[in-house]
């Protein structure tokens, strides 16, 4: 069983890159869809790129790759970031619209990760959110 760590993050995000593209501000997140049990929760990574894209890499239980996606940042229609009370976790909801199709993404991101080799999670998260806010047509940051 592979561990979700900085090595897996780098490999997963690099696999989504276009030629001459680099990723920036990578963070570890938990993804949430409505009505899923805890066994169906997925985890993974988000990062923005030098080609103005959001990379999304999801892994299921036992680090099985689930879904790899990339969204053009100019298709970001809505961004909502909420601080969860009593926790250092943010709930991030994004909505992308491209060619008439709307896709929503909801994830949770903690400012600290332990045992994953991601010492700059808090700083990377702040920079990622600032970048997403620049591109969203409607944002609700808390």
At which residue positions do the language-model features occur?
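Canonical phosphoinositide-binding patch of PH/PH-like domains
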Residues: 99-123
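Short, charged interaction patches at domain edges and termini
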Residues: 122, 126-131
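A short, structured loop/turn motif at beta-sheet edges
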Residues: 18-20, 73, 98-100
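Anionic N-terminal interaction surfaces
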Residues: 1-51
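Short, acidic/hydrophobic/Gly-rich beta-strand patch recurrent on exposed beta strands
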Residues: 92-98
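Mixed-charge, glycine-accented linear interaction segment located at domain edges/termini
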Residues: 130-142
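Phosphoinositide-binding peripheral membrane targeting modules
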Residues: 35-45, 50-92
């Amino acid at each position: 069983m592979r561990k979700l760590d900085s090595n897996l993050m780098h490999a997963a995000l690099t696999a989504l890159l276009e030629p001459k593209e680099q990723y920036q501000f990578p963070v570890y997140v938990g993804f949430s869809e409505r009505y899923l049990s805890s066994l169906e929760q997925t985890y993974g990574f988000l990062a923005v790129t030098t080609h103005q894209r959001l990379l999304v890499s999801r892994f299921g239980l036992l680090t099985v790759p689930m879904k790899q996606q990339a969204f053009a940042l100019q298709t970001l229609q809505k961004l909502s970031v909420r601080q969860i009370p009593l926790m250092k976790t943010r709930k991030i909801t994004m909505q992308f619209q491209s060619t008439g199709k709307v896709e929503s993404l909801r994830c949770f991101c903690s400012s600290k990760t332990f045992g994953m080799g991601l010492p700059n999670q808090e700083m990377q998260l702040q920079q990622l959110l600032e970048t997403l806010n620049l591109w969203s047509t409607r944002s609700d940051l808390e």
